[in-house]
Amino acid sequence: MKNKNLFPMLSVSEVNELLKQEEIFNFIGIEFEKLEKGYSRLKFNFNEKLTRIGGILHGGVVFSAVDYAGSYAVRTLDKVKDGVTAELKINFLKPMKEGPFTVEPRVISEGKRLVVVDISAYDGNSNLCAKALGTWVVYRETNSETQLSS
């Protein structure tokens, strides 16, 4: 039986290795810990290079991590070979000062072309520090193809 989506064929470590090709992924230090259908979890450590004045994590860094996490939760769905962010809204609830930081997205609605994801970002003390809601446009397999094509 063929796999219905891209990531069950890859382990978390293989996904992390694949994403090392993206400079921002490396700069932030993101590492995925879990990939399941409609869910992912990533972590990254505190780094002063990622902070703004006042020693708190820059909002753009949080936004990027949230976008990565949501994107890979979407890619775990049946027959999804790729997805792009159509809309992403974030509420910053508390300053993120202590790591490691965790980001957890969950797919809450799946249509043929649009997927909505609820995303939470936590600091090292498990405080909910940011809440996001995003929509991804998905590209699904239309035949037996199981790899992303260039």
Curated annotation (Swiss-Prot):
Q: Which domain of life is it from?
A: Archaea
Q: What is its EC number?
A: 3.1.2.-
Could you say which enzyme class this protein belongs to? hydrolase
Q: Could you tell me the keywords of this UniProt record?
A: Hydrolase
InterPro entries under this entry?
ACOT13, HotDog_dom_sf, PAAI_dom, Thioestr_dom
| Matching Pfam families | 4HBT
**What intrachain disulfides are recorded?**
none
Q: Which family does it belong to?
A: Belongs to the thioesterase PaaI family.
Q: What is this protein called?
A: Putative esterase SSO1253
Q: What is the lineage of its organism?
A: Archaea, Thermoproteota, Thermoprotei, Sulfolobales, Sulfolobaceae
